[in-house]
């Protein structure tokens, strides 16, 4: 057989699907169409999202636009709070927590609305003629290019469908091709779950058009209007209108479809835009050369995605469909699946959170319902923050910007919530939405939490630690100061220890077990609150010093910080969740809020607070592993910070537990790799990506720690592009047999690079001399000091057991690279 014929056979096999794309490890691929939404593949460009089902006969593209939310501009504070607050506090301090909780609901929770729902636009349907049976089916999502492909053979003809949500063009673009001319025939139409205020029509330009209005909700009028347009460019064949809402293509050689969605949203206070005009503006990019539009899309996407790569090795598992690999992950070694899942989290963040747009919500931007689970809001007691945990470390700082903008806007609206308590500054409670509402919602069981402003501010400060950008810090410092002013007014002295505490509050979504019974959530001075307020004060003092703020303000913060409740170790060696030693070792609640100081905070460390480190480990062990999907993602981060890579890896196997459940506490991963609470919540995807990063590199505790929590199963690998605090970029790190071999670090802003590693190091071939653990002189690489913890008299204590490490200081210059190795370079 000639070489020419061999090449032709190979090409035919690739086209027919007999050889799948195993050469590219960054693909989710399947051998059957999606039947459920959680099997469809997500595309997004930050503004619009699409779920691709891949059905040969009846293709569907479920559509979202980031600003299609119910309701309209408003806030939802309760003016009765001022009068009720002193009484609620008195009841708490008298031990009458149930009575305080009963009063909190009507007195402080919103009496108007509990937040607005994120809503779908609808679905574009393509119904194809003559495709009743098919063979050689294959569909994939290439997360290296952000393109979804479906391929199959029917009636001896090979069909290929490509789809992508163009980043530069802001459109969904779909390309249909066939191996035989005149083989593409279909009808196209929209559907939507809205039952009112919708219109299906054919535009004067022969486009499908869907006009709609988002719903009223809880008495708040829905004022978001949207228009979806689909333009069909057929090469060969005919395009005609077959009804007032359907277009038909007959006998085309190829077809390109362009989907544009516009709304009247201007900002959280203004919905005076023109939805049709916006959709038309985006549609101006349609009709241009497809290959060039595709190349431009890939280039725009890869400027972010290609910054980081992870190679953990591969094996024959890559030859199996992704859903099967998920089913087998806990029992079969599949290092490349872990790398794929890590990168899938980065893919989702790029696709759901673009500069200038909205922050990723509970479902990112993907939702097929009129009322997404938990309304798809920005739940602030962990979920929206978790969405952005991988932003800075995995080199997606630009993707962080929509969340930082949300913080800026909430800080404005939140003045009303602070005033509700007769306080200066700003705050919000456990949820917000596109309208930046800041009131307490969902009743006393969930709404009693005014502390998330401190968590929001942690993101502001942490971003500065990665960049050292003082212009940025000057921009966000007033927000941090405003949050501090709220606590200077809101903190109250509890009578037992005379500590300053947050009251009323709760440990998110958990309730203490008092005398074996659970009867209330509302308390004073939870550990999480104490950790976050301390973190806010400490960070703001550092920022104020950099901003040359007057010392009277920073002195007041330090004075109050000295009177905050310290962390406590309880009777069974646990880190207490509440001020009282109420923790139940049988409590397996999904939230582990008292471990905030371990992750994402930086107050608990093996090297600087070993007693608390062991107490946190005791608490986390008792909480258990399997839980909701997002909880397991958090636990990956926590076990990485506990320097236990094998346990962190166990949590990854738990999170990659297959499920198709839509409700319950049995979390895992859906066939399309979406995280399952269940139902779908995107935060677990981001949490696990952040946790995997922490297994390779940590920089929160005063040094850039290389391979702090490497599991035995990943004995060799290469990671590139991870960002560290201090303005350092880990350009590449290689390891073999569980030991680092080389690491190249670029200093983007100069200053001292402190390295912690498990092996002696050489710099450019010269042996380095270790230094003492005393803090280095780089202000961006400092451990966070804490108050001395209180330890119960009967608490069992142990000393952390961890591998010996070496600490090195390297003076760096801006833009220079430093190559570290564990042996002289000439060996």
Annotated model-derived regions:
Residues 383, 449-463, 472-489, 631-632, ...:
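Extended, hydrophobic alpha-helical segments in both membrane/secreted and soluble proteins
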Residues 363-364, 368, 500-502, 510, ...:
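C-terminal catalytic domain of Rieske-type non-heme iron oxygenases
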Residues 454-458, 478, 598, 614, ...:
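Feature representing long, continuous alpha-helical segments
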Residues 464, 488, 493, 503-518, ...:
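Aromatic- and carboxylate-enriched substrate-binding clefts and catalytic-loop regions
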Residues 1-23:
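Bacterial Sec-dependent N-terminal signal peptides
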Residues 508-525, 669-680, 714-717:
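Short beta-alpha connecting loops at secondary-structure transitions
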Residues 22-444, 451, 460-464, 481-484, ...:
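Aromatic-residue-lined binding/catalytic grooves and analogous aromatic/hydrophobic interfacial grooves
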């Amino acid at each position: 057989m000639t070489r020419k014929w061999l090449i032709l056979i190979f090409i035919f096999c690739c086209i027919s699907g007999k050889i799948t794309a195993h050469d590219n490890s960054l693909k989710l691929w399947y051998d059957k169409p999606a039947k459920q939404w959680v099997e469809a593949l997500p595309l997004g460009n930050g503004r619009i999202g699409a779920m691709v089902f891949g059905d040969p006969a009846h293709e569907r593209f479920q559509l979202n636009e980031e600003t299609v939310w119910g309701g309209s501009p408003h806030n939802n504070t309760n003016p009765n709070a001022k009068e009720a607050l002193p009484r609620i506090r008195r009841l708490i301090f008298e031990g009458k927590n149930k009575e305080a909780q009963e009063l909190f609901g009507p007195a402080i929770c919103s009496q108007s609305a509990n937040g607005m729902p994120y809503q779908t636009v609808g679905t574009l349907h393509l119904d194809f003629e003559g495709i009743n049976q098919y063979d050689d089916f294959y569909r994939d999502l290439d997360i290296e290019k952000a393109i979804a492909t479906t391929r199959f053979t029917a009636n001896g003809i090979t069909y290929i469908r490509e789809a992508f949500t163009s980043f530069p063009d802001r459109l969904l673009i779909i390309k249909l091709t066939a191996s035989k001319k005149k083989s593409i025939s279909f009808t196209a139409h929209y559907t939507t779950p809205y039952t009112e205020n919708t219109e299906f029509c054919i535009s004067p330009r022969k486009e499908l058009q869907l006009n709609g209005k988002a719903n009223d909700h809880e008495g708040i009028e829905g004022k978001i209007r949207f228009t979806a347009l689909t333009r069909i460019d057929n090469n060969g064949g005919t395009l005609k209108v077959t009804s007032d809402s359907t277009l038909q293509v007959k006998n085309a050689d190829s077809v390109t479809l362009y989907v544009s969605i516009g709304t009247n949203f201007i900002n959280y206070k203004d919905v005076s835009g023109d939805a049709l005009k916006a959709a038309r503006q985006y549609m101006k990019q349609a009709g241009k050369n497809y290959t060039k539009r595709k190349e431009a899309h890939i280039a725009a996407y890869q400027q972010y995605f290609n910054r980081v790569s992870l190679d953990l090795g591969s094996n024959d598992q890559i030859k199996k469909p992704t859903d099967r690999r998920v089913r087998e992950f806990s029992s079969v070694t599949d290092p490349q699946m872990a790398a794929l899942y890590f990168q899938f989290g980065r893919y989702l963040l790029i696709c759901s959170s673009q500069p200038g747009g909205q922050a990723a919500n509970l479902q990112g931007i993907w939702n097929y319902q009129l009322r997404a689970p938990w309304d798809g809001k920005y739940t602030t007691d962990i979920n929206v923050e978790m969405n952005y945990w991988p932003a800075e470390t995995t080199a997606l700082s630009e993707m962080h910007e929509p969340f930082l903008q949300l913080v800026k806007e909430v800080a404005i609206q939140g003045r009303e919530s602070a005033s509700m308590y007769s306080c200066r500054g700003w705050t919000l409670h456990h949820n917000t939405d596109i309208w930046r509402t800041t009131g307490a919602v969902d009743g006393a069981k969930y709404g009693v939490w005014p502390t998330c402003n401190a968590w929001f501010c942690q993101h502001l400060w942490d971003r500065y630690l990665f960049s050292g950008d003082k212009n940025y810090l000057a921009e966000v410092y007033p927000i941090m100061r405003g949050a501090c002013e709220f606590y200077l007014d809101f903190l109250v002295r509890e009578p037992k220890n005379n500590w300053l505490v947050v009251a009323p509050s709760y440990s998110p979504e958990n309730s203490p077990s008092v005398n074996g019974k659970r009867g209330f959530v509302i308390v004073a001075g939870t550990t999480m609150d104490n950790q976050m307020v301390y973190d806010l004060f400490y960070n703001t003092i550092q920022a104020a010093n950099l901003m040359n703020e007057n010392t009277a303000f920073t002195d007041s913060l330090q004075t109050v910080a000295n009177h905050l409740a310290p962390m406590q170790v309880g009777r069974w060696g646990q880190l207490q969740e509440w001020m009282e030693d109420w923790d139940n070792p049988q409590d397996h609640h999904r939230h582990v809020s008292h471990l905030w100081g371990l992750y994402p905070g930086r107050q608990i460390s093996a090297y600087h607070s070993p007693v608390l480190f062991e107490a946190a480990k005791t608490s986390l062990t008792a909480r258990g592993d399997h839980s909701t999907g997002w909880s397991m993602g958090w636990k990956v981060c926590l076990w990485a910070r506990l320097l236990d890579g094998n346990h962190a890896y166990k949590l990854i196997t738990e999170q990659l537990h297959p499920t198709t459940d839509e409700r319950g506490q049995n979390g895992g991963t859906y066939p399309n790799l979406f995280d399952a609470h269940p139902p779908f919540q995107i935060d677990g995807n981001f949490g696990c990506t952040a946790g995997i990063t922490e297994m390779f590199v940590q920089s929160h505790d005063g040094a850039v720690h290389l391979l702090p929590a490497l599991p035995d199963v990943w004995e060799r690998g290469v990671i590139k592009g991870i960002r560290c605090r201090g303005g350092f970029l880990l350009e590449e790190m290689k390891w073999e047999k569980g030991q680092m071999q080389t690491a190249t670090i670029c200093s983007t802003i100069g200053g001292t690079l402190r390295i912690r590693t498990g092996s002696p190091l050489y710099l450019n071939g010269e042996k380095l001399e270790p230094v003492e653990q005393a803090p280095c002189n780089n202000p961006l690489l400092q451990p966070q000091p804490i108050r001395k913890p209180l330890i119960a008299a009967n608490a069992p204590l142990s000393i952390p057991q961890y591998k010996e490490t070496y600490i090195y200081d390297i003076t760096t210059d801006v833009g220079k690279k430093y190559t570290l190795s564990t042996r002289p370079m000439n060996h």
